[in-house]
């Protein structure tokens, strides 16, 4: 168990625990080499892994973090370094005062369409650059979107759930991602793709507008996955001018979903009109 003033990898001095959850503990830390404040996330490994599996998950997490470190975008949390401490991977990232979008929704319930599209367009812009670099997020959801003090939204944790072996057991095998926000093809056991990231972003925007994800919050994971796999959900009632675009993002067929570049304030479309390609 880490504590304030611990030195990680001979370089990062822990100062304050700023968050914790299923995907690890996040510390405010001081980089003693570059003299700057950073965020250090200590990642957990999935329970029940054998030593060999734990080592593989550790290696995957380190690899995913190194890949993400190549991504530079104003709406993506920058990764500075990846180190190992007490057998667990630690990701050193940009530090900024923020809360997760999940916390925002917990506090305010829902967003107005103009607020939701601001969040969506910023995250989509970061995803577009990531996808151009061959990086799939695999777990877009409110908990992985940070909202800074100035209202800017940033996406974080690219590929981490996949790397750590954070999976859900289904009749077709193991799936990566958060069941309430994954795409139908992933719920059926398919691989996550750029198009499935678009669906997950659509699910996130739906939740910001309607107060819950498209397929609800069914506590039975298998039942929820069956709902997601069907692709059938209640039409949004509060999406206003983004209703049509949101419907396309949540298309069951990945080929019918728009690219990330269509998810922007300048590309909003009205119901009944097709967006430009």
Indicate where each model-derived feature is located.
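Activation-segment/catalytic-loop signature of the eukaryotic protein kinase fold
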Residues: 82
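AlphaC helix of the eukaryotic protein kinase fold
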Residues: 44-70
